[in-house]
Amino acid sequence: MKPCDEAIRKTLGLADHMLELADEGDEVREDSGCGVLFGVLRDSAFKLKKLAEAERDAHKRKGWWE
């Protein structure tokens, strides 16, 4: 796998991990401040995932994705 594709793959994994962490944090949070924190984490993960998926798809269309 090309280094740029590997970086995109890792970014997708990071976004998935961020979503898992946001879910875990929401389950154990004790105040609204934590709710805001984990909400921002979740929103950021969705934005990051969307960007990384778009870039992965662009690489696939160009025939770069292995």
Question: Could you say what each language-model-derived stretch is?
Answer:
Residues M1-D5:
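Short, charged, low-complexity loops and linkers
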